[in-house]
């Protein structure tokens, strides 16, 4: 499996977002809130919902999205059969490694849930 984040690994359609929001499991961390839903296809999928209410500046929203995409991309082999929507939580700025570890912890918690 390649480590590219191709189009089929992303949640793109509004219907898919609504389904995950309606039927997904929710887990909150210090920096993230993750909604997840088990799916039949072997590839994991990622959707992002980073609100202006949480991060007012575009630079902060973009940093948050980059961290979420990179964490998902590098660990996608461990996340098979799941769809995720990642949202940012209100928090103070943190280092990338701390935010990455928090998101990884939430992914692992959902998979073993």
From Swiss-Prot:
Top-level lineage group: Bacteria
Entry's Gene Ontology cellular component terms: ribonuclease P complex
Enzymatic reactions: Endonucleolytic cleavage of RNA, removing 5'-extranucleotides from tRNA precursor
Keywords assigned: Endonuclease, Hydrolase, Nuclease, RNA-binding, tRNA processing
InterPro entries with a match to the protein in the record: Ribosomal_Su5_D2-typ_SF, Ribsml_uS5_D2-typ_fold_subgr, RNase_P
Enzyme class: hydrolase
Gene Ontology biological process terms, A to Z: tRNA 5'-leader removal
Gene Ontology molecular function, alphabetical: 3'-tRNA processing endoribonuclease activity; ribonuclease P activity; tRNA binding
SUPFAM superfamilies tied to this protein: Ribosomal protein S5 domain 2-like
Quaternary context: Consists of a catalytic RNA component (M1 or rnpB) and a protein subunit.
Annotated family: Belongs to the RnpA family.
This protein's name: Ribonuclease P protein component
Organism: Vesicomyosocius okutanii subsp. Calyptogena okutanii (strain HA)
Lineage start: Bacteria, Pseudomonadati, Pseudomonadota, Gammaproteobacteria, Candidatus Pseudothioglobaceae
């Amino acid at each position: 499996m390649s480590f590219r984040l191709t189009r089929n690994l992303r949640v793109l359609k509004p219907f898919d977002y609504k389904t995950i929001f309606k039927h997904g499991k929710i887990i909150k961390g210090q920096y993230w809130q993750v909604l997840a839903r088990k799916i039949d296809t072997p590839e994991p999928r990622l959707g992002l919902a980073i609100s202006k209410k949480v991060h007012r500046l575009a630079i902060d929203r973009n940093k948050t999205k980059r961290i979420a995409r990179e964490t998902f991309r590098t660990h996608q082999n461990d996340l098979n059969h799941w769809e995720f929507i990642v949202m940012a939580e209100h928090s103070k700025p943190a280092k990338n490694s701390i935010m990455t570890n928090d998101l990884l912890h939430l992914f692992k918690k959902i998979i073993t849930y």
